[in-house]
Amino acid sequence: MKPVNGSGMKRAALINDLSCFGKCSLSVALPILSAYGVEAISLPTAILSTHTGGFEGYVVRDMTDEMRAFSAHWKRMGLKFDLISTGFFSSPEQLEIAADFIHDFAEEETIVLVDPVLGDNGSLYGCFSEACVEKMRALCALADVISPNHTEACLLTGSAMDTGVETLLPLLPCPNAVITGVRRGAEIGYEARLDGERISVYKAYVPIQLHGTGDVFASAYAAEILNGHGLVDALPRAAEFLDACIYDTAKRQPAHWYGLAFEDELKRRTRNS
């Protein structure tokens, strides 16, 4: 078998769903990481014709069996990863597969980033059970850093939905955590505890409904980490990237309602590199 490691390029395993139309999950992670010079390898948890935000009649293909088969093949190949990131899972079984993947592939220097997709706006998504929440807590305990929104932070800690971030951060199952989408007056941003530091990053709130902001942030954050920035320094850089994408998307409303126009910012960065 020909060698597949040692190329000098950072490699990331992305465990998430693939929405073939719409800007979320793997359809944003793959191009963003690639533009940052990272070899991005996808392990799809599901394949959808579109994402589920605002579309009707979408088609879903569950990939649970393929997740196990793909992982086993990569293990036989001896693949190694500098970063493993996770997003959407459709069942407790898939969360167990992801935990097994981390145990099999995460080495001492591998960064594990978990975006614990569970809910938003104060509610657990209807497709999830309490068993999924329990399995997600266990997965977060294997991570080096997690990026829940406020709702997900409350679900992971078993807290009331009005619990403040200062209370939530030390209760989360991972010592390094970025709570995303936190509102503060006319601003929106991030409250984090990273490498023992307490960090806040805020930007002006743009009042439009957006899909996939968490996926774009997590992708940019992973890319910044793999480009040599620590957990702390990568946060404002990823926040700046997302902020630029939001402003670009606002200019394209209402036609671009289904996701972030991240391509504009990638194009600018590619030209300036």
Predicted regions: what they are:
Residues 20, 199-212:
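Short pre-catalytic strand/loop immediately N-terminal to key active-site residues, enriched for Gly-Thr
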Residues 2-114, 118-126, 268:
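Conserved N-terminal subdomain of the carbohydrate kinase-like
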Residues 207-237:
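Short, small-residue alpha-helix embedded
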Residues 25, 29, 63-66, 70, ...:
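General structural feature for long, well-ordered alpha-helical segments within catalytic domains
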Residues 126-199, 208, 229-232:
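Conserved phosphate/ATP/ADP-binding segment of small-molecule kinases
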Residues 232-273:
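Charged C-terminal helix
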